[in-house]
């Protein structure tokens, strides 16, 4: 079965949230394989995280990962920004 690379944009709930603790929690997600996490400065000290996961190309993979992300304390929002099929 083919695999897809799913990239999310995660915004913290507040400016003073510890981004490193969110990053550590993301690394513990077992729903899919974590490929990388990038930090994206937004404004006024606010930093978004852009984790990319590798998952099987079956319906609902992105939704399952998103559910896991939203359970993490300190995350204000999590949305899919890119899905790419891997060869």
Q: Which residues does each PLM region occupy?
A:
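Long, contiguous binding/interaction regions
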Residues: 1-87
């Amino acid at each position: 079965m083919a695999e897809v690379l799913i990239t999310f944009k995660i915004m913290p709930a507040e400016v003073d949230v510890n981004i490193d603790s969110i990053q550590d929690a993301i690394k513990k997600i077992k729903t899919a394989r974590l490929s990388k996490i990038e930090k994206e400065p937004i404004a006024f000290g606010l930093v978004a995280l852009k984790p990319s996961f590798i998952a099987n190309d079956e319906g609902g993979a992105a939704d399952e990962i998103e559910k896991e992300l939203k359970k993490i304390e300190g995350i204000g929002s999590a949305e899919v920004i890119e899905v790419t099929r891997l060869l």
